[in-house]
A protein has these predicted regions:
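An amphipathic alpha-helix signature
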Residues: 20-28, 61-65, 121
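Short, surface-exposed acidic
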Residues: 31-42, 72-83, 135-136, 167
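Membrane interface segments of multi-pass transport proteins and intramembrane proteases
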Residues: 95-98
């Protein structure tokens, strides 16, 4: 049985500020009382530690959520704005780019590669083609509803691939700890944390500021999942199969 590699999209496979700024602009269009949101998000992306209100934001999307909630924007409007912004990627990808060496890293792995994203399907094919990975993803799960939807999704993958009794054969890779890593840890899966802003929100088997820094560890896991988990134990006091709950995105 091949191991299963679960990959996040935004902030993990897809870098660049255009999508999140498009999301902020869509909120401003739908809710004029949120004027100034995009400018504040741009400032956060330029200097993540400058705004005390956003010290816990792990990426631009969480910054948008926190700021828009403060401005009185409700979840339904945010979700609508998000869907509009993702559809616009079919027209303009802006500065979106793949991490260095992504296609080569994925192509050499003997693993079932699953993309799991909160994004809708609209605009996704164009985006994956632009990133050079359209033919390197074996399965796509959209509208995943992370964080709440991640655990049942992972349980399904473990069952579907016959590895429920050996969950270390599934590696979850992502940049939002509550969304991609906490649910995986609860199930005993392997984890790789792309901690872009060095927030250190929770434990993981391996952690780095960028995905390319994690390529060697991902290759190591794909070759020998059980040995990988033994070689990269979780921090003392954090046994596998537990996680501290933290709210994630509502999109």
């Amino acid at each position: 049985m091949r191991p299963v590699l679960v990959l996040d999209l935004d902030g993990t496979l897809a870098l660049g500020d255009a999508p999140v700024l498009g999301y902020a602009r869509a909120i401003e269009t739908l809710a004029p009382y949120a004027d100034g949101l995009t400018a504040t998000v741009e400032a956060f992306l330029a200097e993540p530690g400058a705004d005390a209100r956003l010290r816990n934001a792990q990426d631009g999307y969480q910054a948008v959520q926190m700021l828009s909630e403060e401005l009185g924007v409700d979840g339904a409007l945010r979700n609508h704005a998000y869907a509009l912004s993702r559809a616009s990627l079919d027209v303009d990808l802006g500065d979106v780019r793949a991490p260095s060496g992504l296609a080569a890293a994925l192509s050499e792995l003997d693993a079932h590669r699953v993309l799991v994203t909160n994004s809708p399907r609209d605009g996704l094919d164009t985006l994956l083609g632009h990133l050079g990975v359209a033919d390197l993803v074996d399965e796509i799960r959209t509208d995943a509803g992370k964080p709440r939807g991640m655990r049942p999704l992972l349980v399904g993958l473990l069952d579907d691939h016959g590895i429920a009794a050996d969950p270390a054969r599934l590696l979850s890779v992502g940049d939002i700890w509550a969304n991609e890593l906490a649910p995986a840890l609860e199930l005993g899966c392997a984890t790789a944390y792309v901690d872009t802003f060095d927030r250190q929100q929770g434990p993981a088997h391996v952690r780095a500021r960028t995905l390319p820094e994690l390529y060697p560890a991902i290759r190591e896991w794909a070759r020998h999942p059980a040995e990988f988990v033994r070689a990269h134990p979780l921090p003392a006091g954090v046994p596998a199969g537990t996680a501290t709950e933290r709210p994630g995105l509502d999109i």
